[in-house]
A protein has these predicted regions:
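Terminal export/targeting leaders at protein ends
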Residues: 1-45
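Membrane-engaging insertion elements
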Residues: 61-79, 91-122
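Long intrinsically disordered, low-complexity regions that are acidic and Ser/Thr-rich
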Residues: 40-83
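Short amphipathic alpha-helical surface micro-motifs
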Residues: 2-6, 87-89, 98-101
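Membrane-active amphipathic alpha-helices enriched in small hydrophobic residues
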Residues: 55, 83-95
Length: 122
């Protein structure tokens, strides 16, 4: 079991073919990953989530839950999208987000201009 709590070790573990990854703070990691990748382009969000959460070497491909995600950027604009993901109950630890969950991700910039985010599961 590889435990990770930020983006760099997560990506390294995925690239190294780790089969069993536990994310210690899944909601904030997911939010930061999404915030970072999508700033103002919702197609990037979709692509990114599919790559990270749908990664074949990490995630069990049996069920394909649908997650509804709303992203609020710093201008208050909300994107809503439906994303089909391949998920198992433990992969990445992010995945107690169950079928048809609505996740609201708020994207903000901190005082240094870095994107941050938080996830609210509704």
């Amino acid at each position: 079991m590889t435990e990770v709590k930020s983006k760099k070790p997560l990506l390294e573990a995925i690239q190294n073919g780790e089969q069993n990854i536990k994310v210690t703070d899944p909601k904030s990691l997911l939010a930061c990953l999404v915030a970072e990748e999508c700033d103002n382009d919702k197609s990037n969000v979709k692509k990114f989530l599919n790559v990270i959460l749908g990664s074949k070497n990490v995630v069990d491909m049996q069920d394909r839950p649908k997650i509804r995600i709303g992203i609020v950027n710093e201008k208050g604009k909300v994107w809503r999208m439906f994303i089909n993901l391949s998920i198992c109950s433990t992969a990445l630890g992010i995945i107690d987000i169950l079928n048809d969950t609505y996740a609201k991700i708020k994207v903000e910039k901190d005082e240094r201009g870095n994107l941050t985010g938080n996830v609210e599961i509704v």
